[in-house]
Design a protein with these regions (language model features):
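Short, low-complexity disordered leader/linker segments with a strong preference
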Residues: 1-27, 326
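Short, glycine-/small- and polar/acidic-enriched structural segments
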Residues: 26-165, 172-175, 179-186, 202, ...
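Short polybasic/polar patches that bind polyanions
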Residues: 47-48, 53, 150, 193, ...
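Pocket-lining segment of extracytoplasmic ligand-binding domains
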Residues: 87, 168-171, 175-261
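Surface-exposed patches in mature extracellular/periplasmic domains of secreted proteins
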Residues: 100-102, 161, 246-257, 316
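Short, surface-exposed acidic
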Residues: 156-160, 263-274, 311-318
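Secondary-structure end/capping motifs
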Residues: 226-307
C-alpha cells in the first residue's frame, strides 16, 4: 500500500512540474539585412540578457538570402526582418504586392548621405557637379541625389555616374576611382574616421526633410501578425529592452555584439565608436524606441509618388503600424 501511495505522489509531482513548466517556447526567425553590425545590437542584447526567453520566445537570427530579407517574411518563412522604407516601398503595391507591415524603426532618423575626400568641394550637394559618383543605378537612388542637388542649386545632370557597388568605402575613396559615395554614417562614416581618412559629408535630410525616411526598419508578415498579435507584442517588448539598453550602455552593448559576432572583434574600435554614435540615434527625439511618425512616413511615400518612382501609387498611410510596440 505504501508503495502505491508513493507512486501516486510521484506521478502527481511530475504532473505538477510539467504544468508549471508552461507552454512551449514559440520560435521566431529574425532575418538581418547585412552581416551583424551596430544596427542589430539590440537583438543580440535581448538574446544575451534572456529577455526573449522570459517572453516565452526562442529567437533564431539568420543572414539574408540573395533575394533580400523581406522576401523570407513575405513568403512566411520568417516572422521578422530588417530592411528599409525605400527598399520595401515597391513591394507594397501592384499585382504582386507583398504582405508586409513595418512594425518598428530601428533608428529614428535617416543617417545616410554623401561622403567624399575632404577639401574637394563636395561638402554640399551642389559640389557634386563635375565629380564621379558611385551609383548602383537605382531610380530611387538617383532621384534622391537629384532632389538634394536641386535643393542646393545644383544640377544632377552634371554628375558623372560610375556604376559601382562599393563595399569598402575607405578603400574606394583612397583608390581615387570614385569621388563620392552614398553611405550610412553610423558605420561607413565612422570607418573613415577610424582609418584616419579626412572626409567631407552631408546628410540628405539636412537639405530636404522629406528624405528623412526610415532606415533601417523591422517588417513582419500581415497574416502572421493578424494570427499572432500577442506574440508580436512580446517579441517587440523584449527587442525594445535590447535597444534601450544599447542606447544607455553603448560600450557594454558593443561587447555583447562582438561576443555574438566574433568576426567584428578585429574592428573593435569601429564597433565601439559606431555604437557610441548610434546610441543617440536609436530613440533620439521619439517618445519610445521603434515609433514611426505617420506624417514623415507618408511624406516620403508621397514624394515617391510625385516623382513617378512607383509603378502603382502608394497610399501614404500604408505599410506601417505602431500598435505592436510596448
Amino acid at each position: 500500500m505504501k508503495k502505491v501511495l508513493a507512486l501516486i505522489l510521484a506521478l502527481a509531482m511530475l504532473l505538477t512540474l510539467t504544468a508549471c513548466g508552461g507552454k512551449e517556447e514559440e520560435t521566431i526567425t529574425f532575418v538581418l539585412d547585412w552581416p551583424p553590425n551596430t544596427n542589430h545590437t539590440g537583438i543580440y542584447v535581448a538574446l544575451q540578457k534572456g529577455w526573449f526567453e522570459e517572453a516565452g520566445l526562442k529567437v533564431d537570427v539568420v543572414q539574408p538570402p540573395e533575394g533580400g530579407s523581406a522576401l523570407l517574411v513575405a513568403s512566411g518563412k520568417a516572422q521578422f526582418a530588417v530592411t528599409a522604407q525605400d527598399s520595401i516601398a515597391p513591394a507594397l503595391t501592384g499585382e504582386n504586392a507583398m504582405p508586409l507591415t513595418t512594425v518598428a524603426a530601428i533608428l529614428q532618423h535617416n543617417t545616410s548621405g554623401i561622403v567624399s575626400p575632404a577639401g574637394e568641394g563636395m561638402d554640399t550637394p551642389k559640389g557634386l557637379e563635375g565629380h564621379r559618383y558611385a551609383t548602383w543605378d537605382s531610380p530611387v537612388e538617383k532621384a534622391t541625389i537629384r532632389q538634394v542637388m536641386a535643393a542646393d542649386g545644383g544640377d544632377f545632370d552634371k554628375v558623372e555616374l560610375i556604376p559601382s557597388t562599393v563595399t569598402d568605402e575607405v578603400s574606394a575613396l583612397k583608390s581615387g576611382d570614385v569621388d563620392a559615395i552614398w553611405i550610412f554614417y553610423g558605420w561607413a562614416g565612422i570607418a573613415c574616421e577610424v582609418a584616419g581618412l579626412p572626409i567631407d559629408y552631408f546628410d540628405f535630410a539636412d537639405f530636404d526633410p522629406v528624405l528623412d525616411f526610415y532606415t533601417p526598419i523591422i517588417v513582419s508578415n500581415n497574416d502572421w501578425l493578424a494570427s499572432n498579435p500577442e506574440t508580436a507584442k512580446a517579441f517587440l517588448a523584449a527587442l525594445s529592452r535590447g535597444y534601450e539598453y544599447a542606447a544607455e550602455n553603448p560600450k557594454e552593448a558593443a561587447d555583447i555584439l562582438m561576443e555574438a559576432a566574433p568576426e567584428l572583434k578585429s574592428n573593435a574600435e569601429l564597433v565601439y565608436r559606431s555604437q557610441e554614435y548610434l546610441a543617440g540615434e536609436y530613440i533620439a527625439d521619439a517618445a519610445r524606441w521603434g515609433e514611426i511618425d505617420p506624417d514623415r512616413w507618408g511624406g516620403y511615400f508621397t514624394w515617391l509618388n510625385d516623382n513617378g518612382l512607383m509603378e502603382t501609387p502608394l497610399d501614404p498611410g500604408m505599410g506601417f503600424t505602431n500598435e505592436y510596440l510596448p
